[in-house]
Amino acid sequence: ASYPIRVFLMKDIVTIGIDTSGVSLHKRGYREVAGKAPITETLAAALIMLTPWNKDRILVDPFCGSGTFPIEAAMMAANIAPGMNRSFTAEAWTNIIPKKLWYDIINEANDMIHDDIEVDIQGYDVDPSVIKIARRNAREAGVDHLIHFQKRDVRELNHPKKYGFVITNPPYKGIEIAKVENTVTDEDV
């Protein structure tokens, strides 16, 4: 097994550590393909956690792209551990960490999953090719049955229920903000 060493320098301080993770932790293992400007999985999860959203409330991403916000929300709702679909460098260190311990941790995390829940998580985008990518990513994450993805323009954003959350990573260009602002009224908020 290899033991990658990481050295960090900041001014006159040196920190030396062993990399137990391998690939960066923001790579959850479900997103093989992404859209043009994807938000990292960890940032999406953190932004969702900053809201009072919970699985009993509606969550809509009107510019869902490759589906990161809806997928992270569905994983939270189903209590799926963020690292379930990836491997870690330390898994190969069986001389330090017994293989059985990894199996026990994975089994415990699997036992905590609640995928038979009902949630209202929706992802929309005008580009049908990214909706296809979002569906594939949700399937890889094991939450495709919890999310409704649809080709839809943000100007058609509406929902029969009164309260919920809109969380999104809007496109950086090619959309007129004034049109989006006119779509959402004070009554909608």
Give residue spans per PLM region.
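Non-catalytic substrate-recognition/targeting regions of SAM-dependent transferases
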Residues: A1-Y30
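Non-cysteine beta-strand/loop elements that form the S-adenosyl-L-methionine
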Residues: G17, I167-T168
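Short acidic, glycine/proline-rich loop/turn micro-motifs
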Residues: K27-R31, I177-V180
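Class I SAM-dependent methyltransferase Rossmann-like catalytic core
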Residues: G29-I39
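Conserved S-adenosyl-L-methionine
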Residues: I39, L43-N158
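Amphipathic alpha-helical repeat scaffolds
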Residues: N137, T168-I175
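A short acidic, Gly/Pro-enriched loop at the edge of an enzyme's catalytic core
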Residues: R155-I167
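Glycine-rich S-adenosyl-L-methionine
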Residues: V180-V189
